[in-house]
Amino acid sequence: MRSIIADSKRLVVKVGSSLVTNDGRGLDHDAIGRWAAQIAALRGAGKEVVLVSSGAIAEGMQRLGWSKRPREIDELQAAAAVGQMGLAQVYESRFAEHGIRTAQILLTHADLADRERYLNARSTLLTLLRLGVVPIINENDTVVTDEIKFGDNDTLGALVANLIEGDTLVILTDQPGLFTADPRKDPGATLVAEASAGAPELEAMAGGAGSSIGRGGMLTKILAAKRAAHSGANTVIASGRERDVLVRLAAGEAIGTQLIARTARMAARKQWMADHLQVRGHVVIDAGAVDKLTAGGKSLLPIGVVAVQGVFARGEVIACVDDTGREVARGITNYSSAETKLIQRKPSGEIETVLGYMLEPELIHRDNLVLV
């Protein structure tokens, strides 16, 4: 089996905290130097590389003299602010040894949820690649709280792959790849060499939290691969402990787990809706509506809605789930949650009678709806 990276032109490489720090006690300058050398080699082979790197909080903890990761959000944000300075400095100096310039870009999900800012970020990244610069991306933890609590750079890597239409997302971790079960508990667990990104059985195989220094477990990597596949990007999950892993992957050696994007690439706007807009609420839809959305490519009408969950406004993104709670689709709603509760199970012809007005006959028009 040949590595999919060998034939990839544009890569997004995500390096986890454990691979750039000394067990969370500050940055490992030598390790970062090795990553810079490998990426320089990839650049020499004609590949474009965007690097998504963790490590800011771990470096901030070291600089502030903290031995344990803090629990308070404001302290995590302070550590990120202090540590990001060191992270950028080390990468700049190590890449300079190879004659490569770097750029620091800090992003939040809110940046990518705004269409104008999304397009601006895309334009900036593509320009940097054209200029021969290696963009180094991290989440802007200093201004966001939910990303520190629940976010991870695996997800960010997938979103960046979508953003720049990367060919392959490479997630480097301290594990060899995805196993059929937890190898620490099941001696019969075997490495999954290749699978389809988004295959339901992968989520059952994965699970568990990340390390005390990092944030992402294997499940986040599987979900990241599923997101990356929306724009046609394949994913490789491999151990960053492997010697010259990036160079060997680029040479065609199969290392770790390859997750292949087998579904059709989404249209740019629908991919943006699916991955970059925050879901504000849910509607439970009946079996008939599920069939019309998944098989018929139809709009979602109020008559197909059986329940409304959460509070949302007109123009926000909501998820459509079946009676088991499985998400089927998501899209931009034409009605608020309060309005939807009044018109659920009603034919579209009765909307004006119930509300006194009719904005649209559909709850979600098919042009604003994407299957997930």
Curated annotation (Swiss-Prot):
Annotated pathway: Amino-acid biosynthesis; L-proline biosynthesis; L-glutamate 5-semialdehyde from L-glutamate: step 1/2
Name this protein carries in UniProt: Glutamate 5-kinase
Chain residues that bind substrate: 54, 141, 153
Gene3D superfamilies (UniProt xref): Acetylglutamate kinase-like (3.40.1160.10), PUA domain (2.30.130.10)
Pfam families to which the protein is assigned, alphabetical: AA_kinase, PUA
PROSITE patterns linked to this entry: GLUTAMATE_5_KINASE, PUA
Gene Ontology terms: cellular component: cytosol
One BP annotation, GO: L-proline biosynthetic process
Record's keyword terms, sorted: Amino-acid biosynthesis, ATP-binding, Cytoplasm, Kinase, Nucleotide-binding, Proline biosynthesis, Transferase
Organism domain of life: Bacteria
CDD domains: AAK_G5K_ProB, PUA_G5K
Residues where ATP binds: 14, 173-174
Species whose genome carries this gene: Burkholderia mallei (strain ATCC 23344)
Organism lineage: Bacteria, Pseudomonadati, Pseudomonadota, Betaproteobacteria, Burkholderiales
